Amino acid sequence: MLNFKNIHIGQMIKERIAESEMETLRICNFFNCTEDEVIEMYQQENLPTDILLKWSKLLEYDFFRIYTQHLILYAPIKSENPNREKSLLPQFRKNIYTREIIDFILERIRTNEMSKNEVIERYRIPKTTLYKWISKYSLIKAK
């Protein structure tokens, strides 16, 4: 399982390259860089977003989703402020719960590390959503 708390994006890129069996020459041509520069990127814990976007396109994998999962699991609880102005930034409604996140949460319940209510409160997952996961993936019985 991925470590969503401590993200080392260079290592994840390296793993994805190994999975896809992509040639280093192709990567160097895509980035217009040397093999040493590619190896240096593997060692980076963080990369600039424009570089990460290129990696996502080249490897056909959404590396940004890893950071989204981190926000779901570890961001502080949102404070309700009715006086706050609406953001000019787009508001996304796309389903951001990947199978890895669902498995991570269900595993915490299955091992009694957390109760269903604790999961709902800590990760702000709607109760109906959690119970649908439990039913759909039938790893644990809904009570």
Residue ranges, per PLM feature:
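Short alpha-helical "recognition helix" segments of helix-turn-helix
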Residues: 23-28, 117-123
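Residue-level signal for the short linker/turn that defines the boundary of a DNA-recognition helix
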Residues: 22, 50, 113-114
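Short, charged recognition helix plus adjacent turn
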Residues: 67-96, 113
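Recognition helix of helix-turn-helix/homeodomain-like DNA-binding domains
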Residues: 31-47, 136
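A short, Lys/Arg-rich alpha-helix, primarily the initiator
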Residues: 1-20, 88-90, 95-111
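DNA major-groove recognition helix of helix-turn-helix/homeodomain DNA-binding modules
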Residues: 50-66
